[in-house]
Structure formats: C-alpha cells, structure tokens
Amino acid sequence: PPREGHLVKARYMPDQVMVTGVDEQGTAHHGLLSQPIGSLDLEGMPVVVADLHSSLPAVLAGLRSPDGQEQPRVAYIMTDGGALPLAYSRVVATLSRAGWLAGTITAGQAWGGDIEAVSVHNALLAARHVLRADAAVVIQGPGNLGTETPWGFSGVACGDAINAIATL
C-alpha cells in the first residue's frame, strides 16, 4: 500500500519504504526539531546504549521502579546496525504489549517504529520532547555483524550513539 511521507528507508533496496518522519517538513514536530543547534537538548534524560538487541529486556528491567511505584516512561531507539524492520523484533513486541515501553523510534535506515527519525540525534530529541520519555535506550535491531577484527563489528556504532548523546 502507498505510504505517506517523504523519508525513504532501506534506500535503493527492492523493499525500500517511505515513511513520515518526526523531523520531516510539514509534520507536527518539525518546528520543534528544527530549532538551532544548542537550543534543544535532552534535559538530563538518561540514555543507555548497548550493542546486543537481546540486552533490551535486561536494560529495561534495570530501569523499572519497585512494584507499586510509577514506572518510568522509556523510549526504545532502534538503530540500523542490525535488522532494519522493527517488526523483526519479537522482544520489542513483547515488551510493548507488557507496557514496558512508552514508544519506539526507528532511526537511520531502520523503520517500523511508532516514530521514524532520520538520525539518532533527532530520535533522541523525539524521545524526550515528543514521547516525553524519562529515559531512552539505544540499541541496534536484531542481528549483529562481526569479523573478529578490532573494528569490524557492528557494536562500534555504540560510539556514534554516545557521541550524539554528548552533543545533545
């Protein structure tokens, strides 16, 4: 079916998709996210960055409050280092149904989140300012890549996420 929006994800692949991004011109949050660099930040929102998608449940369990207390609003940001469609993650589907996630954001070439973003930077800002998350977790989609060389594994992208957090 035709999709609205102008962001193309999985570009030049036979199954590329067009989505509406939170940061796209003409959308409700474009004005917010188009503020000058330095005028919008994470407002102290804690962010956990991890490499393995399978670590998401453990990270979320660590962020949860004791029973009977209000639970934090946690956003999951899926980067494009693993599988690109969020729907490939049974873990996210289970955690969403359980109410452990305030929302999902797919960044870069990944797609299928509650919110789509062009970059990890805008995904982080959307987590805080659109989803009103108390915390965010940045982890690639399911599946990772490695070549047994010091720099040849998909986990090095965690450094890119940390740089985005430090910048914001």
Predicted segments with their positions:
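Extended, charged alpha/beta regions that create polyanion-binding interfaces
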Residues: 1-44, 54, 58, 67-75
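Acidic/glycine-enriched edge-of-secondary-structure segments
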Residues: 40-51, 107-114
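Short, glycine-rich nucleotide/cofactor-binding loops
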Residues: 46-53, 149-153
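Short beta-strand segments
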Residues: 49-51, 77-79, 106-107, 138-141
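Phosphate/oxyanion-binding active-site loops and adjacent basic polyanion-contact surfaces
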Residues: 51-56, 84, 115-120
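The AdoMet/dcAdoMet-binding core of the Class I SAM-like
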Residues: 62
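Non-transmembrane, aqueous-exposed alpha-helical and coiled segments at domain scale
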Residues: 67, 71-72, 93-138, 144-168
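Conserved P-loop
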Residues: 76-77, 83-91
